[in-house]
Amino acid sequence: MAATATEDGGLSFTVASVMEDVLQQHGNGLRDHDLVSRRAEEAASRRYEAANWLRRMVGVVGAKDLPAEPTEEGLRLGLRSGIILCKVLNKVQPGAVSKVVESPCDAILVADGAPLSAFQYFENVRNFLVAIQEMGFPTFEASDLEQGGNASRVVNCVLAIKSYDEWKQSGGIGVWKFGGNIKPPALGKSSFVRKNSEPFMNSLSRTSSINNEKAPSENDSNKLSSPSSLSTLVRAVLSDKKPEDVPKLIESLLSKVVEEFENRVTNQYELVRAAPRESTSSQNNRSFLKPLGEREREEKSFKAIKKDDHNSQILDEKMKTRQFKQLTIFNQQQEDIEGLRQTLYTTRAGMQFMQKKFQEEFSSLGMHVHGLAHAASGYHRVLEENRKLYNQVQDLKGSIRVYCRVRPFLPGQSSFSSTIGNMEDDTIGINTASRHGKSLKSFTFNKVFGPSATQEEVFSDMQPLIRSVLDGYNVCIFAYGQTGSGKTFTMSGPRDLTEKSQGVNYRALGDLFLLAEQRKDTFRYDIAVQMIEIYNEQVRDLLVTDGSNKRLEIRNSSQKGLSVPDASLVPVSSTFDVIDLMKTGHKNRAVGSTALNDRSSRSHSCLTVHVQGRDLTSGAVLRGCMHLVDLAGSERVDKSEVTGDRLKEAQHINRSLSALGDVIASLAHKNPHVPYRNSKLTQLLQDSLGGQAKTLMFVHISPEADAVGETISTLKFAERVATVELGAARVNNDTSDVKELKEQIATLKAALARKEAESQQNNILKTPGGSEKHKAKTGEVEIHNNNIMTKKSESCEVEEITVNSPPWPPVASPGQAYREDDRSFGSSEWVDKVMVNNRQDEMRRVESLWGGATTENGIGILPEDFYRRDLASDTSRIFSEHSYNIFMGNNNSTDDLDAATSDSSEPDLLWQFNQSTKIPTRSNIESKLKKPVSKPIRSPQSRNNSNNTVSRPLASQKVGNGPRGMKQFGPADMKRKATNARH
């Protein structure tokens, strides 16, 4: 369809082109929303793809300015420095960009539109554009990286480089060719997109640039003249309309076509009329001669030039607007910087003020904490002094220390049924069920340990008591409680022993070794151990290795200082030796399984530690002994469900514990008679409970509700034990002076015995039968010679010599040394007793003649000159073959205990205590030496004949009342001992 010509010539457009423009605008209006969204999605997808590839190529750190999903503005800001582009191109094509200038500052912090660094702009971007142009990649303008630039061309360039990189990595097969911007399949045949979508007023100028004018014009004319495009547009407009709407739509389209046609004609007429008059005529004349197509091209060229001018004006306005915005932003940033400076100054002043206040507060808190620390140290110091003073008071009183320990619940037991109420440092409360509900009973002891107490805490509290063994004291620690309450755990530890779970036995010996090592420059200590058990009232050695169960005897006053002298005495020098011995002892100990405990101790075990220390400076000897007793638990047969041998064991255990309770009750009431010999257990603990040792009882209880009866009974017994006062413990200390005096006493006794024996024999030879007459007339000395003495006898007083004795008896045969002692004692002669009538006038005469003193009982004390004169006597023959154990000590006090607990009748004891002695005068002694012995008397061999020796005190020694000064026995006692010896 052709248009009519004007007066100057033909029109530059046709009706078909007008119709096509109207139809395209109509179709675009209907699909404008979907098309914009699809284009935006396509552009974003390509932009994200390019950004992700760039980030992978340069790394996350290098591409920190480029987000993974950037907007057009974010992509422009990330790439405008050119650093990322140059680095990527160098990775794809090494050496493509010879020099890359790094950014001096973070690109994100540079204000939008601010001039970039000259190095970045001219070096990086220019070098990149030159390189890609040489390589044949799609290029873009440097202004595209500025605000308002075309980001799609930048994305297209990046994707081209990506495609080239993938082609190279695949092997470079074939010829590389970039496909450009391929539209997705979703935008297929149904999409009708125009190249140029300008308004109707600018529809005549559809060229893209001045440099390429003819080709687009020809393409446009071809498109306009193509009838298929017009019919396609008509079908697209009418395809989705109803039949009844078609007439209205056609009418509307025709009206728009007419209106558009008229507008274009008017515009062309105005353009022609505005041309200069002189050229108008010639142009009009030539216009009729020129072809229609040439005139159209000239008009389009003119329109393009005008459009370019218009675009340049628009760009200038945009540049001015951009500069104004940048200036506004710059001013705003200056104001913000000033505000930030003011805020920084205020914040800095506030921080300085807060720092000053903080320092003042910190100084105040430091002074306060220092005061609290000083007060706390003072409190702990006072507490430690109070504890030491309390322990000293307890030592002076001789009270038995009582510690209480609560066993934790076993695995699988519920802790909600606990009977333990309030628990403090020295007080424990037990919840008991009463008729009116629950009640709380409180008990007070020296120390209370809860279920969470560790073995280290338990041992640290009794450590000073254990260390006193090295100072010469005897110590006894025994664990008491019902079966399954944790006694063996406290004393020995669990079955699987570790360093943290070691019991008192291991820790005590380890601490003794440590302290002995610390004192090695001043003291030399020898330590040996015994381990025995009392099983069914029989004493057995737990350290035997041959499996023999030889029955042992307990001797409270043995000459060796050992309670069980026949038991193995093993020297130890380290904790490892102790662990090996304890393993042997635990292996030999009697244990069994009951309903209350799967590993119940069926015997009382006692670990005895013997310590002898010698002062390297003075030569004084200190002897200490420590009993660590693990008592078998008391049990009720109906709960333990024992039968047979277990029942017999339980009966013996309960009987021995009952005997221990009787002894404690007697000691608490200060009864004159204490039944130590009712049980082997009390006989073993006699030295400890009799006032010669520091004693500690560890009472153990279970927290279960079904054991509340046994718990109350155990705690009541412990309360009675706490009331017992045994008196101050005694130090077993033998100084060099004491040893010398003992040797003098022994020598004088031997000399006196020999001389009196010779005198008796001479008198008997001279006057047969006259000795008894002389004895009845003057009340002289009766001499009994003991030719046979056994190792178990108690006749060896503390005055006997201890030099040249081996440190320990042989372990393999502990009785061998004692048999040798028997032979040596069998050849010696001893004076048993001296009985003198108590006459006051003769004592005064003795005192006036000898210059000595008399005691309150009339016993004469000889001056030292008498003893010095007899030192010249050769008495070494009597003692040269005898050797003693290092654990022999002064047994005077133990003799008293034997007297108090022996089987002798009460009249005999009263007779012994009421007899008085008298020292004869010098004339009487000389006359007696001339008299022969009428009849030698040999005492029978027995175990307890140590009471037959004479105890003569020195002049400097005070002799008191009772058997401590001199031990005396009458005829009745001698008769009883002779009878016992026959049986």
UniProtKB/Swiss-Prot annotation:
Record bears the keyword Cytoplasm: no
Name of the protein described by the UniProt record: Kinesin-like protein KIN-14I
Recorded superkingdom: Eukaryota
Domain Calponin-homology (CH): 44-166
Residue ranges the record marks as coiled coil: 731-758
Domain Kinesin motor per the UniProt entry, residue ranges: 399-724
Location of the region described as Disordered in the Swiss-Prot/TrEMBL record: 203-227, 276-295, 802-824, 921-983
Biased composition (Polar residues): 203-214, 278-287, 939-951
InterPro entries: CH_dom (IPR001715), CH_dom_sf (IPR036872), Kinesin-like_fam (IPR027640), Kinesin_motor_dom (IPR001752), Kinesin_motor_dom_sf (IPR036961), P-loop_NTPase (IPR027417)
GO CC field: microtubule
